[in-house]
Regions:
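Phosphate/anion-contacting hairpin/loop surfaces
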Residues: 69-177
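A cross-family signal for N-terminal binding/gating loops and helix N-caps
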Residues: 1-107, 111-115
Length: 177
C-alpha cells in the first residue's frame, strides 16, 4: 500500500507535470472506483489543475472552482503518467485524467477492487476524509512522542493507526521498528 514516502513522490511529480494545466476530461473505466458523483466527472472538464496534496493516505487533486478528486490507492492502486489520450489498461484501468500533454491513469492490479475515487465540491467536503492522525513531517519530536503515548496501543499499532499518525502503514512501520 502506498504510504507517506510513496505518496510524496506522486504529489511532487504530479505538481511538476500537470500544475495549471486544464483537464480535458475525466474518464471512468470501472464504475466501482467512483464512490461519489456530486459533482459528476463531466464537471471537471475544462478546469485547471491547481495543486495536489495529501490527507492521510489519500491524494487530493484540486481543480478550479473548488472541485476535488480524492484518490485512495489502497493496496495495489497506482498512478501512471502516459501519452495524451492513453487507453486504460483492460482489467486494471480504473480512471483517466486527460490533459493536453498527457494522461494520468489510475490503475489497480489484482482481482480485488479497493482503490477509491471521490469527486467532491467545496473545501468543506474534504473534512470527511480527515482521520485526525498527526502529520509526522510537520510534528516536533515531543508531538510525535505524545501521539504514540496518547492511547494504550502497542508501538506497531500506534504507528499504523491513522487516527494516531497520518500516512504510515504496515510496510513503513516495519521499517521504523
Amino acid at each position: 500500500m502506498p504510504e507517506l514516502p510513496d505518496l510524496t513522490v506522486y504529489l511532487e511529480r504530479l505538481e511538476a507535470i500537470a500544475r495549471d494545466a486544464p483537464l480535458q476530461r475525466l474518464r471512468i473505466g470501472n464504475p466501482f472506483v467512483l464512490r461519489s458523483v456530486a459533482p459528476p466527472p463531466s464537471a471537471f472538464a475544462g478546469r485547471r489543475f491547481l495543486r495536489a496534496w495529501r490527507i492521510g493516505k489519500r491524494l487530493v487533486l484540486e481543480f478550479e472552482g473548488e472541485h476535488y478528486a480524492v484518490i485512495h490507492l489502497m493496496i495495489l492502486g497506482r498512478l501512471h503518467w502516459k501519452k495524451p489520450g492513453a487507453a486504460m489498461p483492460k482489467g486494471s484501468g480504473l480512471a483517466a485524467f486527460d490533459f493536453e500533454h498527457g494522461t494520468l491513469l489510475l490503475v489497480e492490479h489484482g482481482s480485488k477492487r479497493r482503490a477509491a475515487l471521490h469527486l467532491v465540491q467545496g473545501r468543506g467536503a474534504l473534512a470527511e476524509f480527515e482521520r485526525g492522525g498527526l502529520e509526522v513531517m510537520q510534528a516536533t519530536l515531543e508531538q510525535f512522542g505524545e501521539a504514540l503515548r496518547r492511547d494504550n496501543h502497542t508501538l506497531k499499532r500506534a504507528l499504523t493507526d491513522p487516527t494516531v499518525l497520518a500516512a504510515i502503514g504496515n510496510a513503513y512501520s516495519d521499517e521504523i521498528l
